[in-house]
Design a protein with these regions (language model features):
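Exposed beta-strand-loop-beta-strand "reactive/processing" segments of non-cytosolic proteins
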Residues: 47-98, 144-192, 374
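A generic structural signal for short, solvent-exposed coil/turn residues
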Residues: 12, 47-49, 72, 141, ...
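Short, non-transmembrane alpha-helical segments in secretory-pathway proteins
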Residues: 25-66, 115-155
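Extended effector regions of multi-domain proteins
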Residues: 21, 98-102, 106-115, 138, ...
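Bacterial N-terminal signal peptides
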Residues: 5-17
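Structured, charged N-terminal subsegments at the starts of enzyme catalytic cores
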Residues: 83, 92-94, 134, 145-149, ...
Length: 640
């Protein structure tokens, strides 16, 4: 017995490895996740047949982390969303992996968590057993075995006690390549996973099935790595340390790549910039009016999960040879811990001229620039999204989303382009014979928990304008800046203005020797306005697309722009709830929610696989430094 107990103790201590006084933001390990799930299942409140939907680090208290004297006492906790299919109940369990104890249990009412592999498998099994599906395929001369079933979130607010999904169908390819080019157009099913039944079947009289499109796949072997001559970045206990930058990246099951405790070291002091930055939510509304398309509006973060959809990144193909790759562990429905290999990439790359000036032909001062890229890719059904945070030597952070993969297309009778845009080409674009790509939009809501030098910040809106002719603009060339502080959450609902070159500055009470406030400026990038009508139920569920900026007061539980459970949600969740109290924002801990958008009007060049398109915005130091910080970085200043 004693020997067994000793072995168990050794195993437990080895398994935990839980950062006694280290970095609390590091990715949960396989061992920690196993301990957390075992602890939860041992609790009497854990439903016997419940599924694990997501697990994540229960983040440490911001106040405790900023108080360095208390860091050693912080718990290491794992939070899990639990779904009991037998009752339809949702729970949130939090377990302390050091003490192997349950810290908190919450019952979440009227909610449906994001979809998982078990839901996809159940959906396919239900529809394949349904006689009408099999009969419909046989009428088309298609063997049901040759049909691929694609499961979507239902796209509608519905009774939260019933777990609903949609199914659409494609013809399989013999080699498994590009199944999305042969949709069985006009057929779809609404499936109740709770009762395991088909609730609605849509079938047009003569579904269109396009012929196969030429394969897009190249040989899967990566190209030989090209030597960049740049070093591979390093991590110290999970923290990236590159030149003056310090931060910790983590892959969340839901949000994907999330950055913690972002700082810039100046004169030996690691100055705060942001506590947490992540992709909070997405919406992809499709503009086709066909009955099998009107519900296709994907909340990709909250309905499917960016982390669960992580794709492996390969040197020589996705990232350069000098990349530092890291894996991430997640938990499947049944509690099995699964590690996804090489899903986080960190690499340095050339960034061109950092600065340059030629005082004369023989007196040129210049510095070459580099930048650090932190990257994650999510393959969600047909689309691939690449989220990158790019850190520059001048203190700028660029947030970039790459959009690639395969377009979602529909089968059609059209064999040529219709210049007038009749029939199906009113709402979709001809990309190949019998293949139309519906017009759609992509909205990305980023949550930016800014802590510029302190947790007490002020957000200022900055506009440029040309004053009327007169004393202020006698010669017609004047450009003035208007600034006003956002005082409350309701005032913090703001829009991009191109005529006013609008930006937003987050400043602290710290000032330079000359009285300039220390600040970072949000410089907007890709912008799109929603084409969904104001009465559309999806638009009402996605209030974050109504404006480009929302400013709220920090609350650790307010993480998701469309709410914690957008699947089958009703209107008014997320940001509308967070702003209900209209909290004051002057000298408070503020969070910026910035939404950028992309309009996708399909081109033939987007088919059969899309070249990567990019949408981005920037966080730019504005008075944070007293002079150009590139001058202080490592590297030789070249003169001639």
């Amino acid at each position: 017995m004693l020997q067994t107990a000793a072995i168990m103790l050794v195993f437990l201590l080895a398994a935990l490895r839980v950062h006694a006084q280290g970095n609390p933001f590091t990715q949960p390990t396989e061992s920690e996740l196993r301990v957390a799930i075992a602890t939860m299942r041992a609790d009497s409140r854990f439903p016997p047949k419940a599924r694990i939907i997501t697990t994540s680090l229960a983040e440490p208290s911001k106040k405790m982390w900023y108080d360095s004297s208390r860091r050693g006492t912080m718990p290491r906790e794992i939070k899990a969303t639990i779904f009991d299919a037998s009752s339809g109940h949702v729970y949130e369990f939090t377990a302390d992996v050091r003490s192997r104890s349950i810290s908190e249990v919450k019952h979440i009412s009227n909610a449906q968590p994001l979809l998982t592999k078990a839901d996809y498998d159940s959906s396919e099994a239900i529809i394949r057993r349904w006689p009408r599906f099999n009969d419909a395929m046989k009428k088309l001369g298609i063997s049901p075995a040759d049909v691929s079933v694609e499961t979507w979130a239902s796209g509608i607010p519905s009774a939260p006690s019933q777990r609903m999904v949609r199914a659409i169908f494609y013809i399989k390819h013999a080699n498994g390549v590009n199944r999305y080019d042969r949709p069985i157009e006009g057929m779809s099913a609404l499936i109740d996973l709770t009762s395991r039944s088909v609730k609605e079947w849509r079938e047009v009289p003569r579904p269109e099935v396009p012929n196969a499109t030429a394969t897009y796949m190249l040989p899967s072997k990566p190209e030989p790595p090209v030597k960049s001559g740049l070093p591979t970045p390093t991590m110290v206990n999970g923290e990236v340390q590159w030149n003056s930058w310090r931060f910790t990246p983590m892959i969340h099951a839901r949000e994907g790549l999330t950055l913690y405790d972002i700082r810039f070291v100046e004169k030996g002091v690691a100055r705060r910039i942001a506590w947490r930055i992540s992709l909070s939510e997405m919406l992809v509304p499709y503009g086709d009016t066909a009955i099998t398309w009107i519900w296709r509006n994907a909340f990709d973060v909250g309905e499917y999960g960016f982390g669960h959809s992580s794709a492996q990144l390969r040197k020589g193909a996705d990232v350069p040879e000098n990349t530092l790759l890291r894996s991430a562990s997640f938990v499947d429905d049944d509690g099995t811990v699964v590690t996804k290999k090489d899903v986080l990439a960190v690499y340095e790359r050339d960034a061109g001229i950092g600065y340059r000036h030629a005082a004369s032909a023989t007196n040129v001062s210049s510095r070459h620039a580099r930048e650090l890229v932190v990257q994650h890719a999510a393959a969600i059904a047909n689309y691939d999204y690449i989220v990158s945070y790019i850190f520059a030597l001048d203190g700028t952070i660029t947030v970039d989303v790459g959009l690639t993969g395969l377009m979602l297309v529909k089968g059609a009778s059209d064999t040529v382009y219709d210049e007038v845009g009749n029939s199906g080409q009113m709402y979709a674009h001809f990309v190949a014979p019998n293949v139309l790509a519906p017009t759609h939009q992509h909205f990305f809501s980023f949550r930016l928990d800014m802590d510029v030098d302190d947790t007490a910040n002020v957000v200022t809106e900055m506009d440029l304008r040309s004053p009327p002719s007169g004393r202020e603009n006698r010669y017609g060339n004047a450009i003035m800046t208007d600034e006003w502080d956002i005082r409350s959450e309701r005032e913090g609902v703001r829009d991009v203005s191109v005529p006013l070159a609008r930006t937003w500055r987050v400043r602290s009470k710290r000032t330079s020797a000359h009285g300039i406030p220390s600040a970072y400026t949000l410089v907007p990038g890709a912008t799109a306005l929603p084409f969904l009508s104001p009465q559309n139920y999806v638009r009402k569920r996605a209030q974050f697309i109504e404006h480009q900026l929302f400013v709220t007061r920090f609350s650790p539980s307010e993480l998701y722009a469309a709410g914690a459970y957008p699947n089958q949600s009703e209107e008014g969740k997320g940001l509308p709830q967070y702003m209900e109290n209209d909290d004051r924002l002057i000298r408070r801990d503020v969070v910026l929610w910035y939404t950028m958008g992309v309009n996708h009007l399909a081109r033939p060049e987007d088919w059969p696989i899309m070249p990567t398109a990019h949408a981005s915005f920037k966080l730019v130091p504005t008075g944070f430094f007293e002079r150009n910080p590139i001058m202080e970085t490592q590297g030789e200043m070249k003169k001639r």
